[in-house]
């Protein structure tokens, strides 16, 4: 049957049922109990993310399709992150496009209007033509769906590493807006409701949940990839929001198809589904395939009988298929019937409570012998600043209609965080962060670090983080060294979110990100954080003669840094000092509201040098004195490329104000230089380094690589 179930799981369900499941029931169990849908190897740890907060309307405890947070004035935001890694490795266009469609449906399942998307893409070395092909088609798929459906892509991340050569990561986050008293659940609490299905069911995406719960085999798996139809998605979006007041619950048909959607919506009650009533795209489909098909652009609604006609009429006006396929029952049994014959009859609780697994762990944290960095400064600057991770992503943003709906306040690439306007007049900043290189060195510090970095990034536009979702992407959890990094990353994320008092209201776990030889990707957890602008919004601008202020203390911590990755520098990973991140962020927010700064950039990937380069690409030069850097090392390379947390580069005309404000908060700040009109020149300790070639590479690298790919 090609099941992913372990022998222990098969024995477990036999004991619970006191019988042997039939072949179709095995396929249903395989889908519902898949790692993709059940979180059986992670759920016990995810509970540690729960933070009681008066602003949380729907959180991780609720375990629904998206999280929701009160933002005041009767409004709430809905937030979700998802991935389509395995499908994008096989069919990058449809894999990425359906990832966008799926997360939009998660947002509208709460009755919320999607207002922003963010994409996080990681692919392999662009010297390999296949990776160029993957990137082009991933971007094209995201653009095709987002642009067609009218939801702006406002920002994201794009990075490159050999670890993703066979296993690209494609993550999409979405934000929606809804009146908080209009939020819809994805589950029901009473029997007698009719199950209404909108959309056609086809043979695409068969076994997609199971496909996403195993490593890529290198075999023909195209049948497990869903096909995107953004125009149908637009119909689903508009009508779902139109009829939201007429339905009791809404659920997207994602992984596992109807098998999972019906079971989860029933929420401990039961359901009867008549398969012959399901509208089909392909005639004479096998009933078992109908149950687990993951055809896109479908939604399931639980509807009072008196409202069914009105709900279906809304779809009929668009000639979009809509049918009553069953009902919620008081008997806690999930039944799929075909012309009156039971094909599936399984207890709801048995499906919703798969065996939970705690796998062995093996400590892989590295003990590194520190050595002095002895690298030539000039060539090191040129090499690091030329890395593809640091180049402009304008080629990507140009594919997206990021100003559709006119809610985008800060365009992609113009700041460290995206900013959108809300109906209550407030501004919402959004940022995503990940650091797989640091996670490879120390997953615990990485977990703390990505939360802290997202918090700092929001501060650079004047926002304070208030809510987050996470996405945890790892290899096979049964491998002790993989499971160790997973557990450690969760420990770090949990510690940091509790410190900042930021509730994680949802997320995603993606295991089995491995190639056909079983080599796992670098551990790649992500944090998507959102927060309200606290007063004034900072839109970065560079002015001649501005002072360059370095906020925070620099340490000789090069492990997991871009410098270490390129030059194999042995060094300890940075210790994330959350108090320093918090205090330095507060200084930045205060300075923005007092209009004391014109530019703020957190120091992360590429260190201080990369942040200074971010000033230079605006058409200016920068001169600094490394002797002014407050640090535990006098090595110039270490000071320029350390990725110690808690630091910012600030441009100001009142540097002493920044220094004094920092001192009052208990952190350090130093005036290290000035901006000048020497275009593309970085002056370090009175020596000029001409970066014209690097600046040209910054603006043109992606277009040239993609154009030649």
Swiss-Prot record:
Annotated residues for binding of substrate: 83-86, 105, 226, 294-296, 510
GO molecular function, a single term: phosphoribosylformylglycinamidine synthase activity
Positions that bind Mg(2+) 1: 82
Domain of life: Archaea
Localisation: Cytoplasm
Catalytic residues identified in the record: 36, 84 (proton acceptor)
Main subcellular location: cytoplasm
Pathway as given in its UniProt record: Purine metabolism; IMP biosynthesis via de novo pathway; 5-amino-1-(5-phospho-D-ribosyl)imidazole from N(2)-formyl-N(1)-(5-phospho-D-ribosyl)glycinamide: step 1/2
Keywords tagged on the record: ATP-binding, Cytoplasm, Ligase, Magnesium, Metal-binding, Nucleotide-binding, Purine biosynthesis
A Pfam family hit: AIRS
Positions of disulphide bridges: none
Class in the EC hierarchy, top level: ligase
InterPro entries associated with the record: PRibForGlyAmidine_synth_PurL (IPR010074), PurL_linker (IPR041609), PurM-like_C_dom (IPR010918), PurM-like_C_sf (IPR036676), PurM-like_N (IPR016188), PurM-like_N_sf (IPR036921)
CDD domains according to UniProt: PurL_repeat1, PurL_repeat2
Family: Belongs to the FGAMS family.
Record text on subunit structure and interactions: Monomer. Part of the FGAM synthase complex composed of 1 PurL, 1 PurQ and 2 PurS subunits.
PANTHER family for this protein: PHOSPHORIBOSYLFORMYLGLYCINAMIDINE SYNTHASE SUBUNIT PURL (PTHR43555:SF1)
Protein name: Phosphoribosylformylglycinamidine synthase subunit PurL
